[in-house]
Amino acid sequence: MSMDISAFYQTFFDEADELLADMEQHLLELDPQAPDIEPLNAIFRAAHSIKGGAATFGFSVLQETTHLLENLLDGARREEMRLSTEIINLFLETKDIMQEQLDAYKTSQQPDAESFDYICQALRQLALEAQQQDAPAAPPVVAQPAPTAVAGGMRVSLTGLKANEIPLMLEELGNLGEVHDPQQTDNSLEVTLLTTASEEDICAVLCFVLEPEQISFTTPPTTAAKPLPSAEVVPPPVAQPQPAVVEPPKAPRAKASESTSIRVAVEKVDQLINLVGELVITQSMLAQRSGNLDPVTHGDLLNSMSQLERNARDLQESVMSIRMMPMEYVFSRYPRLVRDLAGKLNKQVELTLQGSSTELDKSLIERIIDPLTHLVRNSLDHGIEDPQTRLAAGKSEVGNLILSAEHQGGNICIEVIDDGAGLNREKILAKAAAQGLAVSDSMSDEEVGMLIFAPGFSTAEQVTDVSGRGVGMDVVKRNIQEMGGHVEIHSRAGKGTSIRILLPLTLAILDGMSVKVNEEVFILPLNAVMESLQPQAEDLHPMAGGERMLQVRGEYLPLVELYRVFDVAGAKTEATQGIVVILQSAGRRYALLVDQLIGQHQVVVKNLESNYRKVPGISAATILGDGSVALIVDVSALQMLNREKLLSAAAA
């Protein structure tokens, strides 16, 4: 009787992805000259677990690739093979091909045969060369614990099995070693397993089908007696394997920790967040309707409403935290990228990661990867110099690249910092002028720096597969703005460059300021609001094309009229009769004219594009406490829209 295990595919895919990521991280930590045994053991365990899972599900190509890699890793950790940078590079390449094979299986396709043949041949060739290496001292010391494990074995007990799972478990245990003395009932199986695999390795393979609490291990009494004679003959070797005997108890603790978490589909979390958002909106409606009640007559009801508001906010914060992920998910891919690209560019770069535990909403985590990757590649290519140039400038030949993340209020700040050559102001201005961009020598360094985000802008002398095509930096800026954030750049010639990204922690809720234009209510993101004031006539200055500037403490700011941008009839058209809100977007400030301020509060963001269509100048919508809809303004687009309206009016 066979068992359909296709239902467990996704569990294997998720765990294999994590194991491959761990494998890459540990490979990058290895020092070829003096490899640490702990990362080697971790890499070996990851490969062994993937191989076992691949065998279980019949993924033969992935199983064979991992088997060859596992044998080489075993030789390396037994010191039967000397590691080198080239060997680690081959292991990293193998990991990449294993990822491609896994991705193919995810889509029910067969992995690429050509890359499979190539990597198998490369690994077999490496194994052949390793056999020819002269390492006489290593085998007697390291190989001694293995016969003890095989001679004694371990008793493996599996409980809570279905009848059709027992043959499958026997087959899986057979893949891990020699099975002896099997004893089974209708729902349990107990065998003696002669294997060199640890309890953790066995659990990793069987837990693709079973839960950790269904698996237990005992040691037959005979195994304790067998190692004693060797202890009398050669005391040091017997003492040396003791850490291996101590390790197995750690495995159950790790599994117990893992069993306290569950995998939940993102769609289910999104549905929960939407429902909590609706609850918050309903609570706001009730609060608004109860606001006019007499507190003496309805004191109990109003107290209950206050308690409901606190509970709703606490529930919303708790549910939102479910979607938060550490920045380590993003940062973990850059050590490999920096290592490979620096080698390709013949540069020496040390990468420092800071704030990897800082959390960000999952939807933003996934969208920030591409922009951040482009900034890292740009720093390596354009920012950090080659060793000769750095030495000539009095710097260390090793460049420094820092990726950091930290919370700042309701935002997250992500920085890419290098100690390279910095931006060449004259070169950027000349290139921008040649491309027809509006520039002047009086521009600040920050304004000159922001020119690199203009469409098609590039200062590279030649086009390569790394840079020079003039695409990418404008996309970086646009993508960040679409996430409700903005980018800033600071540079010092000869000292380096810092690119700063500010993003909201989540796109599901927003701290906003409500403003009114006639009877229309708009929401301004609170992180863009600097201050508000009532303008005076002497502070307003007309400009060509119908635009006006507002002087605020010596600074001239463009005046954007919200009623004009969205064609709101009946609004106050005279600036001195309204209120001006000073906004900052993409490092630039401007004044926004509205009729009145209502107040600030937290709102639940509703996607306007999926429910209606994309509207220029509007990023989303929300439902207010009275049930009406308010539009959330895209502050980065208002200046351009205001200018377009003025030009259209002048042309008419």
Swiss-Prot record:
Q: What does this protein do?
A: Involved in the transmission of sensory signals from the chemoreceptors to the flagellar motors. CheA is autophosphorylated; it can transfer its phosphate group to either CheB or CheY.
Domain Histidine kinase, which positions?
255-507
| UniProt modified residues of type Phosphohistidine | 48
Instruction: Name the reaction it catalyses.
Output: ATP + protein L-histidine = ADP + protein N-phospho-L-histidine
The residue ranges of the HPt domain are 1-105
- What PANTHER family does the annotation carry? CHEMOTAXIS PROTEIN CHEA, SENSOR HISTIDINE KINASE CHEA
Q: Which PROSITE patterns match?
A: CHEW, HIS_KIN, HPT
| Protein name per Swiss-Prot or TrEMBL | Chemotaxis protein CheA
Location in the cell: Cytoplasm
The CheW-like domain covers 509-644
